Structure formats: structure tokens, C-alpha cells
Amino acid sequence: MRKILVTNALPYANGDLHLGHMLGYIQSDIWVRFQKLQGNQCIFVCGSDTHGTPIMLKAKSLGITPEELVTKYSNRHLQDFTDFEINFDNYHSTHNSLNKEIVEDIYNKLNNKNLISKKAIAQAYDPEAKMFLPDRFVKGTCPKCKAEDQYGDSCEVCGATYDPTELINPRSVISGQSPIQKNSEHFFFDLPALEKNIKDWIESNTLLQPEVANKLAEWFEQGLQSWDISRDAPYFGFAIPGTNEQKFFYVWLDAPMGYIASFKDYCNKNNINFGDFWGDSSSESELYHFIGKDIIYFHALFWPAILSSTGYKTPTSVFANGFLTVNGKKMSKSRGTFIQARTYLDNLEPSYLRYYFASRLTSRIDDIDLNLEEFVTKSNSDIVGKVVNIASRCAGFIYKKFDATLSGEIFDPELESEFSKNHDAITQAFEKREFAHAVRLIMALADKANQFIDYHKPWQLAKEEGQEQKVHQVCSQGINMFKVLIAYLKPIIPSIVAETERFLNIQFISWADAPKFLINHKIDKFKPLATRIEKEKVDKILEDTKKMFENEQAPQSKKEEPKLDIAAECTFDDFMKVDLRIAKITEASHVEGADKLLKLILDLGGVTKQVFAGIKSAYKPEDLIGKHTIMVANLAPRKMKFGMSEGMVLAAGDGKGIYILEPHEGAQPGMRVK
């Protein structure tokens, strides 16, 4: 039995949760439920992130205390999580005495190791509001990539971190005025001194996502900087000892320690030994942090450095998820797609969204698009039309004609074996967080089950004399195949599974038992387990969202939507002159003397081509080998000083990143793209 501790990023307690938040929490909840079904001791903790200037100022504007504000939103968050079937073992808060003790203890350990220093810095100060401005209360143009409207600590476009003083055309979010520079003594954590610790952690981390590893390599190349861990009063948070409450710990120092506090609180309540899960590096337990891709910097640099230097076990891995778009675009209040968790729950069951997200989630850091039309179609087709429909087609015969008892014989052992054989592949897919692949495997089995029922037509057999035994066996096999499918789906749609357990008079408590058929087993009367989503309900979610935000006043003038610079039109015949082929990357290597190029050897199904691709900044050669991509196969060879380039691989980019195109699973080298 494995000992596994899982955390999820702490939601900030100054506003309601939206569906973009739920993407990450649903992902981790599915994985945790799977681990528990495997029989592992898996503990899942979270809590509210409750400190910082945004909370202080919002509470002031509402005429309440910060404590009242965070209590209000913490309760609302927990209710949203509960109703979305996110099953935390403990939900805590960063604003409590336990977390304060942990923060001060870790700070003192860092200070005793001379990893904390003080220095005067020029800081943004709002002369109108008469206060120093936290990083997130200064906005301007990113000094690295020149993206506009970025926060004062990091860029959401390129991921760069910087000081607010480096922003181009900065402005105060509070007053809109240009901040002035004012000196203040701050406390710094010596991150560069722990570079080896971080690199050792990365090298030992076999589960780190390639995108995270690439980003870390980029940050190392830029050079690590000491981290400002303090903020000036007024501030809602924990005061730094010895500063007479004039300096406070930066929220990003005490927030991750909320993971420790939440788990310690769980241990205290349940008589668990904290060290068994989160002791030192010698512990055999596993520790995983599920986070959004926008906070990789804090979790994959600062956090391992702090833990490794204060005697705590470092994460076994950090798993990041992408952002959520709706109908192919960024979530929008005006379009009604900035959907809050509660707005969804007021109109639809959580199972549908949990299933849709699972059908899209992989181990990669890909953004997920919630296409609402596809969401309706997929939910109705897969959950209702494929899975639940199996039970509804068979249960009535068993209940009415055969005393609600399943057959003692298996009608089609070969088909039963196929459902069992897929167990290992589905298990591996769940373990590796390849939920989309797991769903595809499960739905392929659902198709086979429906084909079986369509072929034997029990509703016709029931009308024929002497076919009672066959009807019994066919419908029993149908119910058993349904049972296996539902057992496989338990981590994804737990509430539908709970209703199924009532219907089947069984509890799915062991993943190993998932593929086992029930023999001579008594079932209950079937009741509908899921109903089709009506488009009107989705429309109502959009309308409710629009109404919620229609009176909001935008603090700044509305920006124009970005326009695509589409190339001149070409004819179909022109397009067909370009021969696009599926290619497998069999070799990839650096090109000596080239800053941007990688040398690729591509297999087109028996034919190989050599290509020099300008993707070095985005990919390591070893990460590309074995991938499938798309290439222009009939591009005239081009002689370069490094050798002959015999084509071009396709990649997308916006000037800030490069992303090679990968075909859908099943595409083979040499296939033409049309």
C-alpha cells in the first residue's frame, strides 16, 4: 500500500470560484479517488488562501473585517467543492495559529542558515492612497515580452518574473495614478544559494512534466534572483517577528505552508503521524501538488528550495494543468462564459462537467476548451446514450421476468474477457493522469456492449417461445458489462455510480474487482440514473452569468479584441499543391553553431527526411524523439551551412512560444493530411 499525500492550490478567499478553477480540482479529485480505489492510503488536503492586500482592501470597501470576508468566501468555496463532488479529506485556512507557527518556524530555520537578508529597495508607492503597492496592485507593460496590462510581479503571457519597478508605464490599480518610488527595507530569501538543491530535486523527479522542466531550464538560464518575502504595513497577514508589525510575510510565503498546516490539522484530528507522510527526504511516502500553470514558478522553484533547506520532504512531483477557454475563447463576462461554479450547479448536475473535463484531460499542460455544444452532445451521447442506456435496455427484463436475479452463466465469455483485459490499460491511464485515454478505452467497451445488445435484440427474443433462457443470459451479460463500465467510471462520476450501487445492490470499493461479473446476483428496480441535457439549460447558464455581471463597471476602457492577420486567400488547387504528411521524429539533436535550430530525422512511412527546425527554444531534443508531427513533404530542399533541409515541420506560435503540431492518436507516418 502506497502512502500518498495530495494537495491542490489554495483558492484565494476574495471571490467566488468559476469553472476555470474547477478544472484543476476535478483533475486532482479524479486521481485521488482512483488511488483510494486502488487501496492506497491517499490523503487529499486543501484550504483557503486568506492573506494579502486584495483581501484587506475588498473587506474595507464592503465595511467588514478581512476575517469576515475570508470566512464568507471560504464557506462558499467549500460548498462549491462539496457540490462538485470534490472530496477533500481536510479543508483548512492559512489564517490560523497553526499556520502562523509553521510560517515562523520555517522563517527562523531559514534565518538561522543565513538564507534571509535585509536590504533597502525602491518600491512603488501610491501618493494618493498613501500606501506601498503590492506587486499585484501595480499594472503595466511586461519588461520582457512587452505584453500590456500585466501584474507587477509576473507576466501571464511569457511567465517572466520581475520587480514592479521594472514595469513599463506602471499605474496603481487603486487610484489609477502613476506610482512614485519610495525606499523601504525588505526581507529577502537567498534563492540562488539553493540552486543545487533545486536542480537535484529536478534531476531526481522522473514524473516532472516536460513543459515544467523546460520552463525551469529557461529560468535557470536567466539566473535565479533573491526573493522578496516581505510586504509593508498596512497588510492583512502574519507580521514578521521583530518588526513591530511594520513588515509582513508576503502571501506567497505563507500560502504554500497552508498545505503543511492543513495536513497537520488532519493528522491532529485523525491520530496520523505527520512524519509518515511529510517527514524528511528519507520518507517513502509520495507528495504531489496539483496546481495551475500560472503558479509553476512558486511551486517548482521557491517551494522545493524552502522545503529542502528546512528538513521537509520535497514534492515527489508538481502537476500543472492548463487554463479553461469556453467556445474557443477566453472566459468572458459579457458573453456569459465567465461561468461561476454556483451558476453551473444551479442548472446542471456536476457529473456532466466532471465527465467532459475528464474526456479532455491528459498529463500535458494543455489548455482545455469547454465547447458548450460539444459538451451537451458528448454528455447525452456517452453518459446517457451509451453507458446508462445499457442498463435501461436490460434491467426491466431481469426485474420482471427473472425475479430480479442475474443469470448463473456467462453468455459470451469472450466478450467478458475483453472487458477484463482492458483493466490494466485503463488502470495505467488513470495512474498517469491520461484521463482522456481512459475515457476513450471505456467508451470503446460501451460501444461493444451496445453492439452486443443490438445484435441479440432481447426485446424481440422475449416475444419468441422458448427463448427465456437466452433473454436471461443476454440481459444479465448486458447488466454485467454496464457494471464494469460504471466501476471504471467511479473516479469520474461518483454520484451516478452511487445511484448505480443502489440499483445493483453492491458497493464498488476495490478497483481490482471492477471487471468481475456478478453471478446469481439480485438487483433492485431500475430508476433513471442520468437524464439528457437540454440546450435550454446551457442557455440559461449563459443568461444567468450575463445578468450577474451586467452592472459591473469596467475599471478601464474596453480593449479591442485582437484581430487575426489572415494571409491573402488561395484557391483549393493552390492549397493542394502543398503535400502535408504525418511524420515520426526518429532522431533529434542540437546543431553546433546554431542558436535556434534542431536537426530532426523524420520517418514518413519508409522514407526518411532531414529537416532543420527553429524550435530549439521550446523543446529539448530528447523530448521530441518518438513524437508524431506534420511536415511539408514536397518543399524544395534548401541547402544550409549545417546541411540540407528537406522539408518543414509545422508549428504554431504567437511570438512568445512555439508549439509543434501533433496529429490525433491513430495517425501513422506517411499519411497525407487533407
Curated annotation (Swiss-Prot):
Subcellular localization(s) per the UniProt record: Cytoplasm
Keywords carried by this UniProt record: Aminoacyl-tRNA synthetase, ATP-binding, Cytoplasm, Ligase, Metal-binding, Nucleotide-binding, Protein biosynthesis, RNA-binding, tRNA-binding, Zinc
Short sequence motif named 'HIGH' region, residue ranges: 11-21
Cofactor binding note: Binds 1 zinc ion per subunit.
Catalytic activity, EC: 6.1.1.10
Keyword Hydrolase applies: no
Placement of sequence motif 'KMSKS' region: 330-334
Reactions mediated catalytically: tRNA(Met) + L-methionine + ATP = L-methionyl-tRNA(Met) + AMP + diphosphate
Binding-site residues, ATP: K333
Gene Ontology molecular functions: ATP binding; metal ion binding; methionine-tRNA ligase activity; tRNA binding
Cofactor(s) of this protein: Zn(2+)
Residues bound to Zn(2+): C142, C145, C155, C158
Principal location class: cytoplasm
Pfam family, one: tRNA_bind
One biological process term in Gene Ontology: methionyl-tRNA aminoacylation
Keyword Metal-binding: yes
Residue ranges of domain tRNA-binding in the record: 574-674
Gene3D superfamilies (UniProt xref): HUPs, Isoleucyl-tRNA Synthetase, Domain 1, Methionyl-tRNA synthetase, Zn-domain, Nucleic acid-binding proteins
Gene Ontology cellular-component terms listed: cytosol
PROSITE patterns reported in the protein's UniProt record: AA_TRNA_LIGASE_I, TRBD
InterPro entries: aa-tRNA-synth_I_CS (IPR001412), Anticodon_Met (IPR041872), Met-tRNA-synth_bsu_C (IPR004495), Met-tRNA_ligase_1 (IPR023458), Met-tRNA_synth (IPR014758), Methionyl/Leucyl_tRNA_Synth (IPR015413), MetRS_core (IPR033911), MetRS_Zn (IPR029038)
Record family assignment: Belongs to the class-I aminoacyl-tRNA synthetase family. MetG type 1 subfamily.
Primary role: Is required not only for elongation of protein synthesis but also for the initiation of all mRNA translation through initiator tRNA(fMet) aminoacylation.
Complex formation: Homodimer.
Protein name stated in the entry: Methionine--tRNA ligase
Organism whose genome encodes this protein: Francisella tularensis subsp. holarctica (strain LVS)
Organism phylogeny: Bacteria, Pseudomonadati, Pseudomonadota, Gammaproteobacteria, Thiotrichales
